C-alpha cells in the first residue's frame, strides 16, 4: 500500500514526546512490512521529522490572520497529499480547519482517534467546544474507517457503528526497550508526566498526596510553577517541559510512575496511555487509575490499580504509599507484560484493517 500519514496542528513539543515517538514507530514498522509511507504534517513550527513533509503556518499573530495562515498551509498540504497519490490516508484526528474536508476526495481516509474529543474541547472553552461539535462530522462522516485505542471510545465516537472500526491499543516496540536499573533512593520517588491544562491528569491529586506524606518525592514533568493552583509543598518538583532524554533522566530516579489519575473528569474509564507503556518498558512499576485496554486482566505485583473516582488518590493514599515503599529496588518483569504491548503485533492488525477498508471500497 501507499499510505499518507496526516497530522494537523499538533504542537511541536508534543511531536517531540511520546506522540511523536508513536508516529515514528508506526511509520518504521509499516515500511518494514513493505509499504510506502510519507508523513504530511500541518504544524505551527518545525517538528523533528526532517525526512518527512512539513507544512508550516505562522500561528504567532491575531486570530483572523492565524486561521488564514492555517487554511493556506492546509491547502498546500492537501495538494501535496493529492500529488502523492496514496491508496489510503491515515488521519490523526484534530480540530477541523478549512478545507480539511477535501481530504476525503483524495483517497479513503481512516481516522485515528485518541480521546473523547467532545468532552476534551468542552473543557478548553465554549468557543472550541462548539467549533468542534459543528465541524467534527466533516472529518468523521465521510471516513472509510476509524481506529480507536479503546473499546470505550468506539461506543462514544461511532455510536451507530455504521462504519468499519478497529481497536488497536497503544503499544511499544519491544526491540527498542531499555530496562533502567532501580534507583537507590532513601525514600520513594513518584513521577507523573503530563501536559498543562489537561485536568484529567490529576496533578492536583498528587499535590494533595504529597502534603500528606512529605518524605515522598513527587516529580511532575510538563508542569511549571505557573501551571498549578495553590501552594505546592517542598517535596513536589515541577520540572516544566523536558525533552525525551531529560524525561528519561527523571524516570531513571523513579520508583513508581503514575498514569492518568482523573480520566473520570473527561468522562472516560478506559485507555492505553503511552506514558504508562513507556514506564513499563523502562521497567518502572506503575500506578493506574483506569481500565487499561491491554493490561486490565494482568495481575503482577508491580502494577497497582485504584478506582477512577474523584477521591481515588486520597482514599487510597495509604495503599499508594505502601506500594511505593514496596517497589523500591524492584523492576517490572517485561517478559510477563511485554507480549500484551507488542507494537509489531498491533501494526499487523492495523495494516490488515487498512486492507479490509480498501477491499470494501472496490
Language-model features: where?
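N-terminal subdomain of nucleotide-sugar transferases
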Residues: 1-46, 208-213, 217
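Active-site proximal beta-strand in glycosyltransferases
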Residues: 3, 104-121
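Nucleotide-sugar-dependent
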Residues: 14-20, 197-201, 245-249, 259-281, ...
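Conserved catalytic-core segment of nucleotide-activated headgroup transferases in glycan assembly
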Residues: 19-29, 173-176, 189-231, 238-248
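Membrane-proximal helix-turn-helix segments that form the acceptor-binding/catalytic region
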Residues: 25, 74-79, 98, 111, ...
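Short His-centered aromatic/hydrophobic patch
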Residues: 91-96, 113
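Donor nucleotide-sugar binding/catalytic pocket of nucleotide-sugar-dependent glycosyltransferases
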Residues: 136-179
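A charged, aromatic-enriched C-terminal amphipathic alpha-helix characteristic of glycosyltransferases
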Residues: 307-318, 324-359
Amino acid at each position: 500500500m501507499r499510505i499518507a500519514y496526516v497530522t494537523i496542528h499538533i504542537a511541536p513539543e508534543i511531536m517531540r514526546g511520546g506522540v511523536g515517538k508513536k508516529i515514528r514507530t508506526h511509520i518504521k514498522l509499516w515500511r518494514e512490512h513493505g509499504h510506502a509511507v510519507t508523513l504530511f504534517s500541518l504544524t505551527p513550527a518545525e517538528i523533528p521529522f526532517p525526512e518527512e513533509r512539513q507544512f508550516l503556518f505562522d500561528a504567532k499573530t491575531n486570530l483572523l490572520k492565524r486561521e488564514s495562515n492555517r487554511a493556506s498551509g492546509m491547502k498546500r498540504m492537501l495538494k501535496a497529499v493529492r500529488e502523492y497519490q496514496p491508496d489510503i490516508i491515515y488521519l490523526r484526528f484534530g480540530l477541523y480547519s478549512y478545507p480539511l474536508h477535501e481530504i476525503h476526495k483524495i483517497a479513503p481516509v481512516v481516522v485515528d482517534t485518541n480521546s473523547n474529543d467532545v468532552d476534551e474541547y468542552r473543557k478548553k472553552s465554549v468557543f472550541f467546544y462548539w467549533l468542534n461539535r459543528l465541524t467534527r462530522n466533516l472529518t468523521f462522516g465521510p471516513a472509510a474507517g476509524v481506529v480507536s485505542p479503546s473499546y470505550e471510545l468506539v461506543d462514544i465516537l461511532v455510536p451507530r457503528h455504521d462504519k468499519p472500526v478497529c481497536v488497536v491499543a497503544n503499544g511499544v516496540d519491544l526491540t527498542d526497550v531499555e530496562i533502567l536499573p532501580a534507583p537507590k533512593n532513601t525514600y520513594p520517588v513518584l513521577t507523573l508526566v503530563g501536559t498543562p491544562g489537561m485536568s484529567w491528569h490529576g496533578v492536583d491529586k498528587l499535590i494533595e498526596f504529597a502534603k500528606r506524606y512529605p518524605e515522598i518525592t513527587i516529580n511532575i514533568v510538563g508542569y511549571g510553577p505557573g501551571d498549578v493552583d495553590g501552594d505546592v509543598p517542598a517535596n513536589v518538583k515541577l520540572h516544566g517541559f523536558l525533552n525525551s532524554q531529560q524525561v528519561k533522566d527523571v524516570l531513571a530516579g523513579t520508583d513508581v510512575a503514575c498514569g492518568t489519575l482523573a480520566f473520570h473528569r473527561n468522562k472516560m474509564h478506559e485507555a492505553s496511555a503511552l506514558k504508562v507503556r513507556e514506564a513499563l518498558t523502562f521497567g518502572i512499576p506503575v500506578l493506574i487509575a483506569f481500565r487499561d485496554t491491554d493490561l486490565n486482566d494482568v495481575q503482577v505485583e508491580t502494577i497497582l490499580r485504584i478506582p477512577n473516582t474523584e477521591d481515588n488518590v486520597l482514599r487510597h493514599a495509604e495503599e499508594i504509599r505502601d506500594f511505593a515503599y514496596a517497589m523500591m529496588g524492584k523492576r517490572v518483569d517485561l517478559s510477563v507484560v511485554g507480549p500484551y504491548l507488542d507494537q509489531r503485533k498491533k501494526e499487523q492488525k492495523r495494516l490488515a484493517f487498512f486492507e479490509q477498508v480498501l477491499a470494501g471500497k472496490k
